[in-house]
């Protein structure tokens, strides 16, 4: 079985029972231990004496099995490949799916210029290995000219043969199909985030979201600026009116074939570029605000993925899109706007715009009577101050918040449950409107933003808010299966939550 994740988004993933002659390199896992490194399980696919020869070569050049350590040695003559790449897995007794995923990604990143590899990592965990290789090999080169585009010797890895004992079973094929679909969804979210705002503005973003939705069989509706104005979407209009690029609201609905299936609303912040508006940001690092639609990218990719997987759960996604710019028509600090549904807001700071567009979309999503609601956004710098750039903050109704955070940790996206202290809500009181969009102080900024959003969650709906301000965009060096730029977080969390709801309600 072979499955291509998407054009240029990842390598061809192929199930195999033996190392084919086409493969140039065999990738194996190496665990560490008190008695030295060991090659991880191979299920008889590679002969024991050959593995022993490989291990001797690896030890001779100093391989230890340290997590994601890469060591390449010539292949024994008994193998058809030219070399063996060992990737460290760490201690065998601590090995889990996420480490396999990260190690596979590290291997994939090191294999530019290689057409085909075979790997035994898939014997340990087929799904994790497939996702790791696919995401590690992802690259974004759309805007590279012929002068700087990767040449033949530096193209991303093209094909991965995933070695398993029984490559033709229905269960094995289904596992690979799911993992390939997840990798494609994550890569699609990365593509959106990495596309510059000159090419991905609200109207274009909406058009691309619609095209993906229609292709997946979703019901799609796009509201333009006139429809938003007429409908009373004051938050989206207020944020977007400073830009010549008019705002949009996209609705994508996946209807399960299962009678009585639970309904989940997904809402994602889609600020295609954020200058801060009149409350303008410092110039240093502002170019990274191309990532301020990371939540929207993840939501679009997730609802499309739910349809492709045929999940027995209903999903309705709302994606508000706007560009936050300073101009003569931009909203001002001190303005008052009316959110969809009627709550009036004093705009104290125009750089706290994400919550304004999310609130409109959340109230509208509530009209679809969901059982659960998840919103996600690159919402606050305070998230990075509190949790760093790899740990999303998860807030919301206690039980569902903890459920989402637990699932996020299990899939390697590491969401962390955070409280919503009641005393912080009072800091959003306004003298001129129902609420202010920020507090007069900077304490607990991530939690205050969640308190703001909580005001727009319908009564009785289980809700989780995932702040991915840091985790959605990697500004440091590559690691594991994550390169620089868009990461696709929290697609894997949200699809796993949908799967969990489909099974457990």
UniProtKB/Swiss-Prot annotation:
Its main location: cytoplasm. Gene3D superfamilies: Leucine Aminopeptidase, subunit E, domain 1 (3.40.220.10), Zn peptidases (3.40.630.10). The keyword Iron does not apply. The active site is at 281, 355. CDD domains: Peptidase_M17. GO terms for molecular function: manganese ion binding; metalloaminopeptidase activity. Binds 2 manganese ions per subunit. Keywords: Aminopeptidase, Cytoplasm, Hydrolase, Manganese, Metal-binding, Protease. GO terms for biological process: proteolysis. Mn(2+) 1 binds at residues 274, 351, 353. Its cofactor is Mn(2+). Mn(2+) 2 binds at residues 269, 274, 292, 353. It holds the Pfam family Peptidase_M17_N. The keyword Nucleotidyltransferase does not apply. GO terms for cellular component: cytoplasm. It is found in: Cytoplasm. Belongs to the peptidase M17 family. Presumably involved in the processing and regular turnover of intracellular proteins. Catalyzes the removal of unsubstituted N-terminal amino acids from various peptides. This is Probable cytosol aminopeptidase. It comes from Rhodococcus erythropolis (strain PR4 / NBRC 100887). The gene is pepA.
